[in-house]
Amino acid sequence: MATPSLRSHEIPAHSQEAGNKSISSGSRRGLLWHLRARQSRVGLFEVGPGHELHRMTRMMQEGLWAATQVSKNNPPTGPTTQKDYLEVMTQVHEEGFELGTLAGPAFARLRKSIGLTEEDYQATLGPGDPYLQFFSTSKSKASFFLTHDQRFFVKTQRRHEVHVLLAHLPRYVEHLQQYPHSLLARLLGVYSLRVAQGKKKYFIIMQCIFYPTSRISERYDIKGCNISRWVDPAPEGSPLVLVLKDLNFQEKTMRLGAQRSWFLRQMELDTAFLREVNVLDYSLLVAIQFLHEDEKGIHHSVFSTFKSIQGVSKSKGTGDQNCRMLPDLPNALHILDGPDQRYFLGLVDMTTVYGFRKRLEHVWKMVRYPGQSVSTVSPAHYARRLCRWAEVHTE
């Protein structure tokens, strides 16, 4: 897929004011960090001094603070233009690294449209508390981090995956404008990091589907197939956070009640978009939280689309946009309450294109696993299958 050429400019970075710790990976190694890493933040490990990725994450934090300062000082005005999607801003830091912000104005507008201020974004991702490392059951070699409050998800990406994201970004933004309650995870920024003259590393920031995390009892990554879709559950009493897969969910059902029809319709709309951009291998993330007795049957205060989502076209009715009444909760776009349980739901990973390599993989898997459900199929088949899974596993 051809990707438009990016327009790059380089500026010196303005460091955060004195009081923040400088980037260092060697100081205070040892017992202190190991004690903090094993504290009660179940299955997540603080990337503190002594951690092999501490220096990299500190550079991310410093770089993101400086990058967001630019968008705070120069907020984009007017409608989004093609230039906004092509812009690359590179900031050179005195500490010996460069951070690139890709399509910065487009993402600044997207953050504003979901009510996320630049001040909040900067404070959460910038220097201060260390990131938390999350060990994924994914086959990907990517590194996964959460901000300390677990609101935002940081994931390293390969260069070609970033090119796919940027190529689809205008249509992604258009889809979110048309369907503001979409289940698609909100992508908040795409960045590059290079130390000295080394190779660039790319990473993305997105809202965490599984937030707020308190009382979440189960987490799943669903693709709608069976091959290699089982994870051995953690032993009872283990603090390890595991994201389970399709076969672990096989005998379960999500009891969505009155929200089921909305959910199934939005799954159709979102997977249709992913099919149109020729993407597969995405996942439906599912987390479950049991409601307390005093929460069951209570209708939380709700607010309408036009009050909660900025930039929504008011010429369209809520029926056209498949809108629902949102709960008055953090991360409301990804939360649906059933009669007994609260569900955290979102579609993630839109970087795998159905090209020649995936077509070959499809043929090979069909030969190796005849008659079985494999992950690598055409985008149309993939979308239908995941929607079918949602229909079968909800009531």
Curated annotation (Swiss-Prot):
Q: Which UniProt keywords apply?
A: ATP-binding, Cytoplasm, Kinase, Lipid metabolism, Membrane, Nucleotide-binding, Transferase
Sections of the chain in a coiled coil: none
**Where, by tissue, is this protein expressed?**
Highly expressed in brain and testis, relatively to heart, spleen, lung, liver, skeletal muscle and kidney.
Query: What's the domain of life for this entry?
Result: Eukaryota
Protein name according to UniProt: Phosphatidylinositol 4-phosphate 5-kinase-like protein 1
In terms of PANTHER family, this protein maps to: PHOSPHATIDYLINOSITOL 4-PHOSPHATE 5-KINASE-LIKE PROTEIN 1, PHOSPHATIDYLINOSITOL-4-PHOSPHATE 5-KINASE
What quaternary arrangement does the UniProt entry report?
Answer: Interacts with type I phosphatidylinositol 4-phosphate 5-kinases, including PIP5K1A and PIP5K1B.
The effect of D281A is:
No effect on lipid kinase activity observed when the protein is purified from mammalian cell extracts
Q: Which InterPro entries match?
A: PInositol-4-P-4/5-kinase_C_sf, PInositol-4-P-4/5-kinase_core, PInositol-4-P-5-kinase_N, PInositol-4/5-P-5/4-kinase
Annotated PIPK domain residues: 37-394
Segments carrying the region annotation (Disordered) are 1-25
In Gene Ontology terms, what is one molecular function of this protein? 1-phosphatidylinositol-4-phosphate 5-kinase activity
Source organism per UniProt:
Mus musculus (Mouse)
Q: Name one GO cellular component term.
A: cell projection
